[in-house]
Amino acid sequence: MVSKLEILQRFYQIYLEQESDYFIYQEKFYYICRINNFTNDYTYYMNSLNLAGFTIVNNCFNRPVTMDYILYTYQIEDYHLDTFIRQSMIPIQSTVEIIKIKESWCKILDEAKCKIGNYASRISHFEHFVVLSYYYQGLGECAISILNQIKSKEIPAGIEHFYMNDSYEVLCCPSNFVVASRIKDLATGYKNNLITINELEEYISYTNLSTDELIYLYARLLFPGQFMKLAINDDCNDSQVKKRLLSIYQNIDNEKLILIQAYEMLSRYTYIPKIAWL
C-alpha cells in the first residue's frame, strides 16, 4: 500500500519528513484525504456559504485524483459558526430512519459494555472510568428510551459534520461532511459549549422543528457518544486516554447542567419524559 508521503513525493513533488493530513509546505496550507461521498458536492456547498473553502491541487498529470486521494490547498478565511449551523438545518431530499438510529445506539452501548467488562478487572483502581461507565451507560439507555416517544418513522436530513468545532479547518474540511439528521450539528454545537441555551432556542424557533425533531434533539444530547467512542476504540489504560477520561469526569456537573437546561427549555415546546436521577 502506497503511503501519503509517497503519493505527495511522486505525484506532487512535495517532500515531507512526517506523514500528516494537514501540513504546511513552502508557506502554503495543504490537506490530503481520500475521495468520499461528498467530494463532488463540496464546491457547491462552500459556494452556498460564500466561502472559497479548500481548493483541489492537480497532480503532475494534471488530474485531481491520485490513487483515490485528493490534495487540497486552502487559506483560512473569515467565517461565522452561525452560518454553518443554519446551513446544516436546511433539509435535503433525504431522511434518517429512527429505527436505524436506535439500532446504531444499541450497538454502540453493547460494544462499550463488552469492552468495559474486559477492562474492569485491570483498571479497577481507576475509579473515574468505573463511575463514568455506569453513568453514561444509564444516559445512553435513557436516550434510547426517549427515542420511543417519536411517532414518525423518519426525520429530515441535512448536510452535517462528523466532528464539530469552531475552527475553519474543521468546519470546511472536505472529509468532515455527512448526511445525517439536520439537528446533528445543532446538538453537537450545544453539547460542546459552542452555542448557549438561548442560542439553541433561537435556532429551534428559526427552523420551526417538528415535535419529533425536538424529542430527538434531547435524546441526542443525552446519548454519550464521546465517552462511548473512547471506551470502544481507545486503550483505557493509556495515560493520555486516562487524562481525557479524568477531564470528562471533572466536567460531569457542567454537562448535567446543560442537559437540565435543555430539558427545561424543550419541555416548554413538547412533552419529554423527565429523568429522575439527572
Place the predicted regions along the sequence by residue.
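A glycine-centered beta->alpha junction motif in the catalytic cores
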Residues: R63-Y79, E111-R122, G189, F223-S247
